[in-house]
Structure formats: structure tokens, C-alpha cells
């Protein structure tokens, strides 16, 4: 059909796709995935939630974006409340690399009065060295009629949810997508009707989920996660109309050890808070400082060695395109399998089988 052909060829004025589809197509070696790339020429590429670009592939991602701008004459627009540092020297170790050569510029002027005008929340930081356990946290959350609490792991979400009053809603990737969407729809309806609603969630609500709570609790994590969580609080500015601000409480969960990139982000934020009272963390300067510290803690920005595969044999014009295409996987799903879940229509289909 014409619509299917346009989807495969990106032969339309506006194309909506995912980061995975976009970047994996740019590094693909099969004709079926490459035939659409010429349509990127002279286009505007809008990357929503740019902070979600995977750090482990940041080097090849920024390289290909630079090529799109320089050779394809494309314009790249990053949209995010927490813009990472994509230009200059990124990282400090042997994996450090030079980011975008073309400077990233704001499309609007940034002034202190603009930040003041958009101030919608008040951040409350935990006292240094203090922690809270699940029981204490559940008691505190139960004191609110409408509250969102975001924790770092599915296990933490489950443990906290078990201690909450009846009627509390739970969100995590332990649920199938259909169930998640149904719960999000229910949350939005309850908020719209001004009904009591308490939600325990993992960070899946921090990007692309348009919900607005007067109070948000967030387990300690990286600054980008804290700010994204704050974006679910007084999102529409309704409290400002009555002279109030949304309340965001950051807490240290007892006996929690953050690993991987989440742990590196938390370490970078702790370093900033050691010399700051946390009142100016929404500023671009503080965000740049955070990402500089975060990247300095990272071990790799090209875990599949895509640069080596494509440039090692440059002098002999020997490029390992097929291997690079195989290894450039933003989501490693080679060992994954699809399953039919007995939820919603899935239950009916299982009965028919």
C-alpha cells in the first residue's frame, strides 16, 4: 500500500520513528533498511528526550549526527529538559572522544527570569547520610491523597507497593505494555477528576508520560532522572495559579546499592551536592557540570567498537560494514523471545489456542 511504502522509504513530509529504528538504519548494511536514508537529506531531525540516547553508543551516535549535518545538510534539533553535553571533549579516560564539531546552540535565549517564570516545583533534598526504609516511606506516602513515588528498580517498586494502602497503583516493566497503558490511562482519568490516586512506579514514567501530580517522591539517582521526575510535578502550573509550588522530595532508600550507569549518575550528583545547596540544579551550567562528571565516570562510549570496525581499515578502503551493522544494537534482543501474555485480549487468544 502507499502508506506502507512511505513507512519503509520515509517518503513523506513528516516521519515519526524511534531512536532504535533511526540510528540502526543509519548503520545498517541491508538494502531494505538503507533505501530510505536519502530522504534525510535537507531535513530537520527532531530527537525527543535526547538524554535517553544510550551512553554506550554515544560516540558512533554523535559521529553519525555530525555526518548528517555536514554531508546531508540536515538540521538536528534536540528536545529535552535535561540536555546532555554533546560537544567538546566527552569523558576523561582512554575512551574519551571529541563530540559534535558543530556547536549546540539554544533556539531560545536563556535568562534567569525565564527560569523563574517556569519555576513550578520546590526540591527537598535528604540530609547527608540519612536513609529511609520501605515502611517509613509507605507511611509518609499514605499521608497524601495524590502522590507519585518513583524508585530505581522493579524490586523496590514491588516491595514499596506491598506496603501501601489498598487502591494504590503500580507501574513497572514487570507488567506487559497493554497493562501499563491501561494503568496510565486510569491515572490520568483520576487526576482529571481530582480523585485520590497514589502511584508507585519505576522510572518508566519519567519520559513521554504526561501526568501531573502535586507531590512527587524520587529515590536518589542522577540529576537528569531527578529533573525528569520533577517534570511530573505541577507539570501544568496549576498550583502556581493559587500561589503554590509542587513539592518534590528526594530520598535515600535504605540498603540500596546503585550499579552501572545509574550508580555513576548518582555519584556525579552527590559530588555536585557536596559543594552546592541544590537550589540551582535546573540551570544549564549545573546540567553541563553534571554531565561532565557523569561522563568522566563512564568506561565506554562505543562498547561494540563501531568506530574501529569502520575506520581501522580506512587506508586500504576496507570497511567492516556488515559486522558494524550486526553489532550496532541499541537494544540487544538477539536472545529474546516473544510471549503471549494472558492479559486483556491475550487471555482470549490463549483460550482459543
Regions found by a protein language model. Give the residues of each.
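Interdomain hinge/linker at the junction between the two RecA-like core domains of SF2 helicases
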Residues: 82-142
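C-terminal helicase lobe and adjacent C-terminal extensions/tails of nucleic-acid helicase motors
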Residues: 69, 135-144, 150, 155, ...
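SF2 helicase motor core recognition
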Residues: 25, 157-158, 197-213, 228-236
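Inter-Walker segment of RecA-like/P-loop motor cores
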Residues: 1-27
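Loop/turn-to-beta-strand initiation segments
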Residues: 11-15, 20, 41-44, 71-77, ...
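SF2 helicase catalytic motif II
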Residues: 19-23, 31-71
